[in-house]
């Protein structure tokens, strides 16, 4: 049975149903009498169903219609499945391409990071080399300056030592307090060069100077106490000598007076 015949058959069935619907309200009288005799039903009365008329001389193959509908549904389902798998395949390809791009970008970033690290390492090495070169030049310059200063100080020390020798020759072996102070300062005074020192070395040097100052203060205190003791002893001896000289002067006058008598 072709599609045209199936369509004609469906149109005939529709016409028969319309005819049945038109013929159904032609029997109102018995229904109206029943409605007057008894109360109205709770639900409407369904008209009797009339089977569709099958045209004579033509046999309808329902199995063929069902088979065609199944084939059509199967074809649509197969089309949907094919579209779904095509879409899924496309999405998988896009996902694989996205993963490849991510891995490629990650590798590029790692390469760029490695390149930057190497550049930074080279820059740090150049800076360290330049710093070392400058430190060597500064150390060499400081050494030259120290040598010049030492030479000047040695010359000054020689002249100062000659001056002290001359002063000693003039005054003999006795030295004044000023001369002794100058001599001791010239022996103890040393040049302090801290330009080349780092933070730790400066801290150690400061600790050393602090201990040295503490030692000097201690020695100064001891010397001051010793000086006080010596002054006290000198005063005591001076008083004794003065007292003894008074008695000696009185005894001398008596003897002289005795002679005169």
Swiss-Prot record:
**This protein's UniProt keywords:** Muscle protein, Phosphoprotein
Q: Name one GO molecular function term.
A: tropomyosin binding
Compositional bias (Acidic residues) at which positions?
A: 1-30
Q: List, alphabetically, the Pfam families matched.
A: Troponin (PF00992)
InterPro entries the UniProt entry points to: TNNT (IPR027707), Troponin (IPR001978), Troponin_sf (IPR038077)
Lineage: superkingdom: Eukaryota
Give tissue specificity per the record. Expressed in soleus muscle. Isoform 4 is predominantly expressed in fast muscles.
Give start-end positions of Pro residues composition bias.
42-54
Q: What does the UniProt record say this protein does?
A: Troponin T is the tropomyosin-binding subunit of troponin, the thin filament regulatory complex which confers calcium-sensitivity to striated muscle actomyosin ATPase activity.
Give the UniProt family note: Belongs to the troponin T family.
Q: What is this protein called?
A: Troponin T, slow skeletal muscle
The organism's lineage is: Eukaryota, Metazoa, Chordata, Craniata, Vertebrata
């Amino acid at each position: 049975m072709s599609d045209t015949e199936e369509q004609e058959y469906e149109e005939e069935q529709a016409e028969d149903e319309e005819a049945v619907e038109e013929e159904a309200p032609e029997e109102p009288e018995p229904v109206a009498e029943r409605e007057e005799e008894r109360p109205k039903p709770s639900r409407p009365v369904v008209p009797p169903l009339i089977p569709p008329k099958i045209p004579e001389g033509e046999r309808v193959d329902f199995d063929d219609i069902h088979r065609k509908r199944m084939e059509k549904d199967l074809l649509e389902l197969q089309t949907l499945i094919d579209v779904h798998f095509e879409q899924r395949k496309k999405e998988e390809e896009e996902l694989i391409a996205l993963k490849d791009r991510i891995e490629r970008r990650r590798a590029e970033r790692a390469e760029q990071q490695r390149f930057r690290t190497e550049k930074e390492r080279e820059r740090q090495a150049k800076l360290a080399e330049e710093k070392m070169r400058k430190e060597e030049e500064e150390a060499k310059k400081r050494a030259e300056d120290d040598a010049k200063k030492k030479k000047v100080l040695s010359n000054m020390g020689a002249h100062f030592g000659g001056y002290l020798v001359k002063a000693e020759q003039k005054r003999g072996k006795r030295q004044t307090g000023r001369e002794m102070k100058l001599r001791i300062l010239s022996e103890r005074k040393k040049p302090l060069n801290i330009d080349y020192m780092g933070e730790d070395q400066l801290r150690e040097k400061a600790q050393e100077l602090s201990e040295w100052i503490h030692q000097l203060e201690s020695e100064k205190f001891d010397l001051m106490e010793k000086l006080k003791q010596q002054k006290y002893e000198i005063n005591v001896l001076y008083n004794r000598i003065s007292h003894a000289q008074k008695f000696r002067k009185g005894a001398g006058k008596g003897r002289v007076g005795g002679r005169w008598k």
